Amino acid sequence: MPLFFSDNLRAALECLLFVAGGPVSVDSLAACLGVKPGDVDELAAELQELYAREERGLQIRAVAGGYQMCTRPEFASYCEALLRPELPALSRAALETLAIIAYRQPVTRTEMEYIRGVKVDGVLNTLISRGLVQEVGRKEAPGRPILYGTTPKFLEFFGLKDLKELPPLEDVAASQENSREAGGRGSIPGHPGEE
């Protein structure tokens, strides 16, 4: 039996997402509300529709395998005027390395360095310490190098539901070929910080 009356479940979901401050898995929400995971998806869809219809400043988004309450992008400038980011923005080198990992994961440090044409040790350590990248295994190759991949925090950071929301790799590959023709080694173009 649900913890709340059925008429209040949508409001209860709204409260849970508000106090969470970040993405909450469907299973966690279902357990708190005493409903099935499919019911959470239906309640979230109702909230999404309500927020869109009433043109609220907030939205409910499917992010990293769950749901999150967040501000609508068109109101970002107001939020930025009020808040200062806790962490400095990612450098161009970090964004390039992160793009390589996102599109080619799992990927080794050596593969990243080949694509970028420079060492990535410092940048990789920064991405790991920020929780955007993690070790995901070992490559079946001599020396068994560490493989890296993105984390759920990466999805949250970029507001993605899953990696399928990244721009199609074909578009990136075409831009990469243009970069090679211009004399580059093939770093992943089409991402913030590209010149």
Curated annotation (Swiss-Prot):
Homodimer. Homodimerization may be required to stabilize the binding of ScpA to the Smc head domains. Component of a cohesin-like complex composed of ScpA, ScpB and the Smc homodimer, in which ScpA and ScpB bind to the head domain of Smc. The presence of the three proteins is required for the association of the complex with DNA. This is Segregation and condensation protein B. It holds the Pfam family SMC_ScpB. Belongs to the ScpB family. Participates in chromosomal partition during cell division. May act via the formation of a condensin-like complex containing Smc and ScpA that pull DNA away from mid-cell into both cell halves. It comes from Moorella thermoacetica (strain ATCC 39073 / JCM 9320). One of its GO terms (biological process) is DNA replication. NCBIfam families: SMC-Scp complex subunit ScpB (TIGR00281). The keyword Cytoplasm applies. GO terms for cellular component: cytoplasm. Its main location: cytoplasm. The keyword Cytoplasm applies. It comes from the Bacteria. It is found in: Cytoplasm. Residues 169-195 are annotated as: Disordered. Keywords: Cell cycle, Cell division, Chromosome partition, Cytoplasm.
